[in-house]
Amino acid sequence: MSNQDNNTLKVGMVFISMIFFIFGFVTTFIITLSDPVREAFDLSYTQAFLVNSAFFITYALFSIPSGTVVKKFGYKSSIVFGLILIAGASFLFFPAIQIESYIFFLGAIFLLALGVVLLQTAANPYVTELGPPETSSGRLNLTQSLNSIATWIAPLVIVFLIIPAAVDIGEIAQAVQPNDLILPFMIIGAVVLVIGIAIKMIKLPEMSQEGLGNFSSTFKYKHTLLGAFAIFCYVGAEVGIGTAISSYIVQDGLGGGISRELAIKFVGLYWAGAMIGRLFGAISLSDVKSASKKHAMAAGVLVWAFIVGYVTLDFSVNMAFIFFGFAIANYLLMQLGTGKANKALAIFALVAAALAITSMLSTGRLALWTIVTIGLFNSIMFPNIFSLAVKGLDRSEVSLASGIINTLIVGGAIIPLIMGVVADLSNIQYSFIVPVVCYLYILFYALVGSKVKPTVEQAPTTTTGA
């Protein structure tokens, strides 16, 4: 490879890394936005949670069609088109907010989400082409790390661009107005459009398309179908909690008198927990043989966890230490399941369910911290469920199974809506029974549903967990 080609790939990797940051940021931004939107449009919980439904329903409708688009037009062109969709949708929020039409607002979210789905469909495999095959896993880890950082930052952006603007005009609980929502979307639209134009102008290789089998062959694997539903439950629970958490902890007694601004920062900490947990997971599954080196790397992540807690929560040392303590517990529990994907998944699902139940049955800071730190235990669920769901499948079947699994990300549309209905019928605290049920199903899948039962065409095989 010439130096010119090598430099082109490096520049391309920089821009594709931005793609992962963008769809991580946009997704979490929309999830966290439901509470300010509820105030701005004077909505019920059910109506406000439609924000997530409008976003995540696209996974059910367009995950598989997006694959067809990528196959026809190529990865680079599909990525550029996805960015244009996101930018265009972002600019549509201006008229939607000006006329105060919530239906128009939801339509803009739907279009924006369509761009995100297209990006996710194209970007993951495209990263593997931007360099030697032997370093592809490292490139994927880098892009996923940027995605996790974006999910931490997005709620903080809401605090700085939406909540402070509202504080100036009156009481926080009643302050958010529709016009306060415009600026973030205009910034997102402008930045994404510039990146899309830049990627269009860069010369990058197109990725070859391999033939796939048919979907019927994938449906014979019971553990794959049960795994797809586990993804439905995982995404639904994670998004549902992330959506409800700020409204939940500002209720009298639950958050111990926490302001709306700090409550949304706790949402950022919830998503940061997933980032910390994934770093621990990467260390546990790394090629490093020395236990002492792994523990040293984990210590570095713990320091990072303290810094994240300190910066996110208004530079509070006490709250940073609390988050630090939960991060230690997360790492220690992860060691119990190292090398066995189903065991680690079972432990984390059980802990997540226990934390949600504890939060439901308590008040004050205990209710706050037990719900926020569930993010730490959501961290490894997606990769572990995915690895268990595709175990025993051949290469073409894995691609098809991936399409089915991506479709079931629609759980992010349905579970939060169910939580909204429960919150309106009772209160938001009791709505967390819905994610509890989700985590219990994931526990079932880890212990029972993930076991591979050979088909007639398939002899028994032995595989190892992720």
Enumerate the predicted regions with their spans.
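Glycine-rich segments within core transmembrane alpha-helices of 12-TM secondary carriers
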Residues: 135-166, 402-415
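Central cavity-lining transmembrane alpha-helices of secondary-active solute carriers
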Residues: 50-68, 268-280, 414
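Extracytoplasmic
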Residues: 11-43, 123-124, 154, 241-249
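C-terminal ends and interior cores of transmembrane alpha-helices
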Residues: 84-99, 304-317, 331-337, 351-363
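Conserved MFS/SLC helix-loop-helix module at the cytosolic interface between two early adjacent transmembrane helices
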Residues: 61-103
